[in-house]
UniProtKB/Swiss-Prot annotation:
GO cellular component labels: cytosolic large ribosomal subunit
Protein name as catalogued: Large ribosomal subunit protein bL35
PROSITE patterns on file: RIBOSOMAL_L35
Pfam assignment, any one: Ribosomal_L35p
Organism, as annotated: Microcystis aeruginosa (strain NIES-843 / IAM M-2473)
This protein's encoding gene: rpmI
């Protein structure tokens, strides 16, 4: 059976936690157009790394077979 292919776009955006049971991701909306967003919003809410939601985890794992 041939090797499974990894979706490279997903590989750049997601990584496993230390235990490998969960998947980490960056929060959206902190790339550009930042002038009108408050410093508190950018620092506290958008800077945190968060986990992929349980309902989306299956799809992410299909895109990353060797995660």
């Amino acid at each position: 059976m041939p090797k499974l292919k990894t979706r490279k776009a997903a590989a750049k955006r997601f990584e496993a936690t230390g235990s490998g049971k969960k998947i980490k991701r960056r929060k959206a909306f902190k790339n550009h157009l930042l002038d009108h967003k408050s410093a508190e919003r950018k620092r506290r809410r958008l800077s945190q790394i968060t986990l992929v939601h349980e309902r989306d985890e299956k799809e992410v794992r299909l895109m990353l077979p060797y995660l």
